[in-house]
Amino acid sequence: MIYFDNAATSFPKPKEVIDAYNFCLKKSCGNPGRSSHSLSLRASEVIYEARERVASFLNSYKPEGIVFTYNATHALNIAIKGFIHAKSHVIISDMEHNSVLRPLEKLKKEYGVEVSEFSTSAPDLESEIDKYITSNTVAIISTLASNVTGRRVNLASLSHAARKHGIYLIVDASQAIGHIKIDLKITPCDVLCAPAHKALFGVQGLGFAYFKDTTRGLTLMEGGSGTDSISTEMPLLLPEGYEAGTPATPAIAALASGIDVVDKIGLNNIENRLSELEKELSERILSLPKTKIYGADMGIVSFNYDNIPSSYISAELDKHGICTRSGLHCAPSAHKKLGTLTCGTVRVSLSFFNNRREIEKFYKAMGEIAKRI
């Protein structure tokens, strides 16, 4: 099997990540913060060490600002529904995932929130954002990289625009983290949301959010936090203020190990290798007649063959043992921009662990598929 669906979730997982997960299940899986026995205390240590590891990876000095969530979608919902008030205005990119679009749609219908889209292809991103600022604009919400094309959105420009206008910046780093350096001291934001299971090589069912302000806003969910149990309200301070219920300790341990793997390889090495593989893959795809590529970055290459439905091509590749993703990728705005809203695209998404031999097999498979059509 050739796995080219890493933008959905990375596979295979590094041995270090699997070992950390299994070790936690066997040795450190008490309920953290709920009891005073040794297993509970060790689980609490695992979680705190992971907070420190995530904070260090982002060059943040606030481990208490790292909140563990079920996934990046959960993190984005906490941020969006906690920061955006009724009748306010937000500015988003034209490449957003449904994890941003759908929460905002709910706020539009129920609370009269207004939404404007800026163009990620504008030559001057900051000036482009400036055009949409109004007196009731409260936030910029943007991906750092499209999950359809890999197109990057410059964090420095987003950060400067938000600070200039005194508004929140909420960042979706799902497709960028683990691929490029994110330094929150140099390019600050108010909230950064990410999953564990993509380029950080963690497991599904875990994400996190970084909050610059460690006093919580409105809560999305309430419950036990292991602290201040006499109160019927969630704690005001983070991380407990947003972490209701028992956390996924083994997954959190695996995330810390995944970050160690990324650091060991080196972000520059990851970026350079993916750039080389993207280039070779793009050249191979374009050497086939009737193909069109819509973008190639962050390990993502999206394409279509002739006028054939992307779902058909992806299904045919699966028969050759090649895993890709077709359709709209939960990002209709991006496909509207690309002109692929009716057909979607075939998305090939690579990781550091893919190789040229797999690209060659993909090319041969596409050649055989093209002959049969």
Question: Can you name each region flagged by the protein language model?
Answer:
Residues 1-373:
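Pyridoxal 5′-phosphate
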